[in-house]
C-alpha cells in the first residue's frame, strides 16, 4: 500500500533495507509500533497484523483515525476542496488560515483531516511546517509535471480504510502531544 500523504524526512528510502530485517513471524504475531509514523510508509509496506501508529502531531493522527472511521466523508470533503481549489488559488490560503481561528480545535475532525491532506497535496513539496505560533505556513506549490494534483485519492483512502478495519488486523493510533 502507498501512503495518502507525503512526509518530509520519511522512512521510504529505508523500506527495502528494513524489510530484510523483519521476519514474517514478527509481522504475523508481534505488535509493530511506529512512534513517529509520518506518512506511515514503512508500516504500509510491512502491513503487520497488529500495529500502533503514533506521532506528536495530532492533526496527522487525526487523518488516520478519519480514514479508519469515516473514509467516505473524507473523500466527499476532499472532492469539494479539489473543486474549490480549481476555481481559485486564494482558496489554498483561506484553508491554510483555518488554524488561526480560535474555533479550529473544535472543528469537525473530518474537516480537519481533509484540510491536512489538501494542504499536504497542494503546498510546496508537501512540506508540513508550522511557525512559532503553531500555524501552518508552507506556501502554495505547483505540480512540476503540469498535471492536476490528485487531492482526493479515493482508491488509496479506501484501501487504507479496508486494511485498518480488517477484523484480522488490530490497528491503533496514539498521539503523544
Regions found by a protein language model. Give the residues of each.
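Conserved S-adenosyl-L-methionine
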Residues: 28-85
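SAM-dependent nucleic-acid methyltransferase catalytic core
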Residues: 2-22, 26-27, 71-177
Amino acid at each position: 500500500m502507498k501512503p495518502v500523504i507525503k512526509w518530509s524526512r520519511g522512512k521510504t528510502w529505508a523500506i527495502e533495507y528494513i524489510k530484510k530485517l523483519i521476519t514474517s513471524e514478527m509481522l504475523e504475531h508481534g505488535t509493530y509500533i511506529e512512534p513517529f509514523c509520518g506518512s506511515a510508509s514503512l508500516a504500509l509496506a510491512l502491513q503487520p497484523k497488529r500495529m500502533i501508529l503514533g506521532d506528536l502531531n495530532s492533526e496527522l493522527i487525526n487523518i488516520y483515525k478519519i480514514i479508519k472511521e469515516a473514509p467516505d466523508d473524507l473523500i466527499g470533503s476532499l472532492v469539494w476542496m479539489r473543486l474549490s481549489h480549481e476555481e481559485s488559488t486564494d482558496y489554498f490560503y483561506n484553508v491554510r488560515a483555518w488554524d488561526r481561528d480560535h474555533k479550529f480545535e473544535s472543528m469537525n475532525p473530518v474537516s480537519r483531516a481533509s484540510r491536512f491532506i489538501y494542504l499536504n497535496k497542494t503546498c510546496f513539496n508537501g512540506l508540513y511546517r508550522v511557525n512559532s505560533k503553531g500555524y501552518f505556513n508552507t506556501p502554495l506549490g505547483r505540480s512540476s509535471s503540469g498535471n492536476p494534483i490528485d487531492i482526493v485519492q479515493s482508491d488509496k483512502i479506501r484501501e487504507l480504510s479496508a486494511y485498518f478495519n480488517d477484523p484480522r488486523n488490530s490497528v491503533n493510533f496514539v498521539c503523544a502531544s
